[in-house]
Amino acid sequence: MKNKQTEDFPESFYVMIEIPMGSNCKYEYKEELDNIVLDRVLFTAMTYPANYGFALDTRGKDGDPLDVLVFSSVSINPGIIVRCRAIGVAEMNDEEGEDNKILAVPVDKVDPASSIVRNESDIPEYQKDKLKHFFEHYKELEKGKFMKFHGFKGRDEAVKQLAEARLKQ
């Protein structure tokens, strides 16, 4: 999806939500359909620990827009675009290679609960443990698929990865 990004990118950036927090369905935006489709119902008895989407106007090393996990006080519906700020990176890889996730929160004026979170170190350990557990196990029952979690990096690394992935205008 090619859209205008924020004027202060990568300090703040737009994320299209594909999967709401608490969902057991994996939805994906399909550019050729200009719509969100149901990719699959998760094979495991698990739900997404945060809202999941992608940063508009970016391309990661895998050729897809950068994945973003949006921590918020509410579940956000698929297709909604949220102005966010980066707080860190969850480094991981799957069966196809590097598959990092930018960690973000909505900007403070969108979700006031975000005001206390400035870096990944501000996320409570139990939430980081849930995120790690989810990504290490949600593909277990799917043949040939896996996800390996490597660790968390802070806000500066997230901003760097966003800047490097920005599509040329």
UniProtKB/Swiss-Prot annotation:
Gene3D superfamilies: Inorganic pyrophosphatase (3.90.80.10)
Gene Ontology MF terms: inorganic diphosphate phosphatase activity; magnesium ion binding
Reaction equation(s) it catalyzes: diphosphate + H2O = 2 phosphate + H(+)
Disulfide pattern: none
Name of protein: Inorganic pyrophosphatase
Subunit structure, as described in the record: Homohexamer.
Organism of origin: Thermoplasma volcanium (strain ATCC 51530 / DSM 4299 / JCM 9571 / NBRC 15438 / GSS1)
Binding site for Mg(2+) 2: 67
Top-rank taxon: Archaea
Predominant place of localization: cytoplasm
Name of the gene this protein is made from: ppa
Keyword terms, alphabetized: Cytoplasm, Hydrolase, Magnesium, Metal-binding
Entry binding sites for substrate: 26, 40, 52, 138
Family: Belongs to the PPase family.
Classification via PANTHER family: INORGANIC PYROPHOSPHATASE
EC number of the protein: 3.6.1.1
